[in-house]
């Protein structure tokens, strides 16, 4: 049975809901740079008289959820959105969040809005429609949140790395569920769901990731960029003396064990004065949140700490170290 038939069957037996239209649109990161896709999401809402007591069901990956979420948040200043994330990355992270947005001016999520979804349905069946690479790469956010929030979960990821690499259903589904719960719990109980302050621990490694995505014209996936960013800031935390060296290499080893990248060639791009372009991402990251630059680093597995500067020379040494490890194929 195709997805359209499944949707119709699901809603047929729910007499209090009336299906108006099933709309298929393009997904992937390209949809976040489209100048028309937000309106493409709004037009059916207007056409069918969808009101603030109606629902938009959105089925897709993280980028698609971001765009249609913004459409729903904008129409009537907010139509109820029910998310059905279809990828590992969306199910274990962004799908349970409160952010919606698109890329603009070459910057990640420059246009967007905070809007709490009415509901999120993580159906594991969707994961088995994805490529092996997509399913593995989405685990970068699980590694991230474990490093920041839950050392026991990190230990579990290490212990189950072979099963996760092989995409064994029981391991994959448990990793996704535990990651989603940690993300949702922080948003709901962390005290700043709409990021009015200057700290955002769930964006560990993301200042690098977002800039690398931009430098590659968004050809580098968010999941892979996060893997590199997490590896870099974890090693940097150790080089600054905040995190044990052994723990830093445990994290890098876990990412490598999941067949995820810990370095990317975009890190070698430099301006005319020889400064790595990725470091422009620090100011863009600060501007996006506002206030003082605040980047999360690690002082233990499962324990993050806010810092307000990055020593570029020391960080560069980490880039070079991970580049060497990556080129030599060392599963550190």
Provide a role label for each language-model segment.
Residues 4-55:
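ATP/NTP phosphate-donor binding region
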Residues 12, 16, 116-119, 125-132, ...:
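Generic secondary-structure signature for well-ordered alpha-helical cores
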Residues 27-28, 59-61, 204-205:
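Glycine-rich beta-strand-to-loop/alpha-helix junction loops that act as flexible
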Residues 50-82:
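Active-site and donor-binding regions of nucleotide-sugar-utilizing enzymes
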Residues 69-163:
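A glycine/threonine-rich phosphate-anchoring loop and its flanking beta-alpha core
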Residues 140-143, 242-332:
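C-terminal charged capping/lid subdomain of soluble metabolic enzymes
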Residues 160-274:
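Active-site segments that bind and position negatively charged phosphate/pyrophosphate groups
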């Amino acid at each position: 049975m195709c997805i359209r038939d499944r949707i119709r069957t699901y809603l047929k037996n729910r007499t209090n809901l009336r299906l108006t239209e099933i709309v298929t649109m393009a997904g992937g990161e390209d949809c976040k740079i489209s100048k028309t896709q937000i309106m493409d999401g709004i037009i059916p809402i207007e056409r069918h008289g969808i009101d603030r007591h109606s629902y938009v069901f959105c089925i897709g990956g993280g980028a698609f959820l971001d765009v249609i979420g913004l459409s729903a948040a904008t129409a009537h200043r907010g139509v109820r959105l029910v998310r059905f994330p279809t990828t590992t990355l969306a199910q274990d992270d962004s799908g349970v969040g409160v952010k919606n947005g698109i890329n603009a001016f070459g910057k990640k999520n420059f246009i967007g809005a905070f809007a709490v979804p009415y509901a999120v349905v993580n159906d594991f069946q969707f994961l088995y429609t994805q490529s092996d690479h997509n399913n593995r790469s989405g685990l970068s956010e699980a590694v991230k949140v474990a490093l920041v929030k839950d050392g026991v979960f990190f230990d579990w990821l290490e212990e189950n790395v072979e099963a996760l690499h092989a995409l064994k259903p029981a391991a994959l589904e448990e990793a996704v569920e535990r990651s989603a719960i940690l993300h949702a719990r922080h948003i709901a109980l962390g005290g700043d769901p709409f990021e009015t302050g200057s700290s955002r621990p769930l964006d560990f490694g993301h200042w690098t990731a977002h800039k690398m995505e931009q430098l590659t014209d968004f050809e580098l996936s968010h999941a892979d960029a996060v893997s590199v960013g997490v590896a870099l800031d974890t090693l940097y935390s150790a080089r600054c003396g905040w995190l044990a060296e052994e723990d830093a290499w445990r994290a890098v080893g876990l990412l490598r064990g999941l067949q995820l990248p810990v370095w990317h060639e975009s890190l070698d791009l430099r301006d005319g004065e020889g400064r790595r372009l990725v470091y422009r991402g620090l100011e863009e990251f600060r501007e996006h949140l506002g206030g003082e630059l605040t980047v999360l680093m690690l002082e233990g597995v499962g324990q993050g700490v806010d810092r307000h500067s990055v020593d570029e020379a020391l960080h560069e040494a980490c880039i070079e170290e991970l580049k060497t490890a990556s080129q030599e194929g060392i599963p550190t």
